[in-house]
């Protein structure tokens, strides 16, 4: 079936709906928010699709991201009289997404569905806490028609002014470039062909130009969008990239107990300003911005803009197989996968996971346990070399990330074979000086270099 995810299991609680490929997760937008796409052209005729099941599947999917800021891209092309839901259904759907904080009127009917009983996502506390509209930061409607305008007028009395400001219309796909990572979007071929037709019929007018700048050599002080090797070469052999070190140190000192850390987005203007300062080698003082979520967004942005994911393209297929490993052997499986990483990637990953493990240990305050952190960081650590990760791929990707965070000490405390990773310089005891003493205290950014926290391995050795 066109659009179906080949990795989709028939045991999926919503297989009857998911097999059509109507919903896809397409990485993050330029604001660091998770992107979910909805493609009308993949909706079968109404007699072949239970629209109530579609609504429940949409909620099931969004429930994985609703605690974080997120974006929806709605591809309107392909909606017709044969597959169009009724206006009454649309009104009831909007009202259901407006339910929150203890509205249980839908609960008995939902749990009575035998297929939903097998799904663990519908626990009562999580249903109470649905915040679909609150954390939806943008709804991009692509190729709107007169039907959309009529529908908007019908639903307008139900839609708040604040929510209405989140809806943005795009006549052409090219208009998405400014807001999203276009190459990560899962766009059906039918939508691409329709967009080409629209442009050719637009009376010779050229479509809105994309704002992708021409490629330029990176600055010597460049921090974003360059490889780990480039950062090492330009920072006197430092293995931990300066942006990663400074944001982690700041968050360790001031953000570990911040509720919802890493869940919120930040102003794109602020993010770009900080990126510009870092790339120009200028100092950044996060205290000046007065928002602890800004360095958290900068950290995710740095990982997301690496030319190759920190876990590397080569490890992608191995990581997808983690769900096939027996539960008791998964930690060992993670260690085996990490053995294939380049040494530099391994050291940076260990540093990052040590920090995220510390965040998870404060989850009673910040509400960010290893599972929640994995949902945020999974797609920032690994993605395929071509296209984007499918919805079904998110399960193993997030599981792998959760294991790295939850079992950090077991996975990273014992070094691999000497020829592979060995000990990082700051974990080599008397054989090497600590990293913070092995390089100058001032980096290209002009900031004072923070002191590394002791690693669990070093602490264990001291106890011995």
From Swiss-Prot:
InterPro entries: CRAL-TRIO_dom, CRAL-TRIO_dom_sf, Rho_GTPase_activation_prot, RhoGAP_dom. The gene is ARHGAP8. Signal peptide: none annotated. GTPase activator for the Rho-type GTPases by converting them to an inactive GDP-bound state. Gene3D superfamilies: CRAL-TRIO lipid binding domain (3.40.525.10), Rho GTPase activation protein (1.10.555.10). Highly expressed in kidney and placenta. Also expressed in colon, skeletal muscle, small intestine, stomach, and testis. Not detected in brain, liver or spleen. Overexpressed in the majority of colorectal tumors examined. This is Rho GTPase-activating protein 8. Residues 13-199 form the CRAL-TRIO domain. Residues 439-464 are annotated as: Disordered. CDD domains: SEC14 (cd00170). GO terms for biological process: negative regulation of endocytic recycling; positive regulation of ERK1 and ERK2 cascade; regulation of small GTPase mediated signal transduction; small GTPase-mediated signal transduction. It comes from Homo sapiens (Human). Disulfide bonds: none annotated. The record marks 263 as: Arginine finger. Residues 226-412 form the Rho-GAP domain. One of its GO terms (molecular function) is GTPase activator activity. It comes from the Eukaryota. Keywords: GTPase activation. It holds the Pfam family RhoGAP. One of its GO terms (cellular component) is cytoplasm. The keyword Phosphoprotein does not apply. Coiled coil: none annotated. PANTHER family: RHO GTPASE-ACTIVATING PROTEIN 68F, RHO GTPASE-ACTIVATING PROTEIN 8.
